[in-house]
From Swiss-Prot:
The protein's name: Probable dual-specificity RNA methyltransferase RlmN
Top-level class of the enzyme under EC nomenclature: transferase
Organism: Salinispora tropica (strain ATCC BAA-916 / DSM 44818 / JCM 13857 / NBRC 105044 / CNB-440)
Residues binding [4Fe-4S] cluster, per UniProt: C132, C136, C139
Family: Belongs to the radical SAM superfamily. RlmN family.
Gene that this polypeptide is encoded by: rlmN
The entry's keywords: 4Fe-4S, Cytoplasm, Disulfide bond, Iron, Iron-sulfur, Metal-binding, Methyltransferase, rRNA processing, S-adenosyl-L-methionine, Transferase, tRNA processing
Keyword Metal-binding: yes
Length: 372
């Protein structure tokens, strides 16, 4: 294997200072919304009324809330329901089962989110940052660099829009209701900790305060920000933690996941096991299979030893192509042998379904490009 240049990364570095978007009702819980509507001279019940439209009926345009007086709708459009995401392009593939949306934010930043329909469920993949500062060399988002954190409402609004797409029947062969959310889009979710946790609370709060999703159907991915993992374990949440490991040894992980230069494999796994112990939730270990880089039998055996008898599941990801990448996905026989060795060690292992490749909507491909 050709050694890669180490890319220093500072996980504590702030995102570029940029004007955050105007406030939106999804930035607040129901009590906060009630305070806001009274400040606007409206009765408190308007907060529940508008929340029912937004979270219960998936209506994002105040003009469609026709049971509200026209003057109230105008006030709300300006103060509580500003446009946060302007659609640039929406693409579909997998016979209509996968949709990718490209959004322009108020400051011109671009982000993407993906909807994936299955016979028994509908999942959305949300972005938490515009770009990403983690600099993983095999990920298109990481190579683009970090622009800024998204607001709570910018995160939630992606889910509400895509839930509306599902409700419209546009996702072939799938239920009409959003059931799962994965924070695996653009950005490192735990580097935008407060807003991501607030967004999770909106997603799981019962309607009309939120979307009413199950906490157990929310997955938060991280490259391994150890203090944030421990902080998440202390929250009153039982979401699934997905750890983007990609290598079982520090020498290689320092190259593939530069934040490993700050927190080594042993430290990251220790935090993950603490999370599993506190929440009772199995940790998902994400591992991109890269030909001749991290797919050797001895690395499978080492990974198996690290994970044996732990509350963990390995999710192997066939490497998805990105522009200019020097790497390829591991051949299928190599992938099968990797799986065999992990299972022989007693580690639950599956290979991820590669959805959205045709539209650059698969894992590691989100780059928010406006070109064709």
């Amino acid at each position: 294997m050709t050694s890669l240049p180490l890319t220093p990364v500072n996980p504590d570095a702030p995102a570029r200072r940029a004007a955050m978007p105007p406030r939106h009702l999804a930035d607040f819980d129901l009590a906060g919304r009630q305070t806001l509507v009274t400040e606007l001279g409206e009765p408190r019940f308007r907060a529940r009324q508008v929340s029912t439209h937004y979270f219960g009926r998936l209506v994002r345009d105040p003009e469609q809330m026709t049971d509200l007086p026209a003057a109230t709708r105008e006030k709300l459009a300006d103060q509580l329901l500003p446009t946060l995401l302007t659609p640039v392009r929406e693409l579909a593939c997998d016979d209509g089962a996968t949709h990718k949306a490209l959004w322009r934010l108020h400051d011109g930043s671009l982000v993407e989110s993906v909807l994936m329909g299955y016979p028994d469920r509908v999942t959305v993949c949300l972005s938490s940052q515009a770009g990403c500062g983690m600099a993983c060399p095999f990920c298109a988002t990481g190579q683009a660099g970090l622009t800024r954190n998204l607001s709570t409402a910018e995160i939630v609004d992606q889910a509400v829009y895509l839930a509306g797409v599902a409700a419209s029947g546009a996702v072939a062969g799938s239920p009409p209701r959003l059931s799962r959310v994965v924070f695996m889009g653009m950005g490192e979710p735990l580097a935008n900790y407060n807003r991501v946790v607030a967004a999770i609370r909106r997603l799981v709060a019962p309607s009309p305060e939120g979307l009413g999703l199950s906490q157990r159907h929310i997955t938060v991915s991280t490259v391994g920000l150890v203090p944030a993992i421990r902080r998440l374990a202390s929250e009153d949440l039982s979401v699934t933690l997905a750890l983007s490991l990609h290598a079982p040894d520090d020498e290689l992980r320092d190259e593939l996941v530069p934040v490993n230069q700050r927190w080594k494999v042993s430290e990251v796994l220790e935090a993950a096991w603490e999370y599993a112990a506190r929440t009772g939730r199995r940790v998902s270990i994400e591992y991109a299979m890269i030909k001749d880089v991290n797919d050797q039998p001895w690395r499978a055996d080492l990974l198996g030893r690290l994970l044996a008898d732990r509350l963990a599941h390995v999710n192997l990801i066939p490497l998805n192509p990105t522009p200019g990448s020097r790497w390829d996905a591991s051949p299928k026989p190599v992938e099968r042998e990797f799986v065999r060795r992990l299972r022989a060690a007693g580690v639950s292992t599956t290979v991820r379904d590669t959805r959205g490749r045709e539209i650059d909507g698969a894992c590691g491909q989100l780059a928010a490009a406006e070109g064709p």
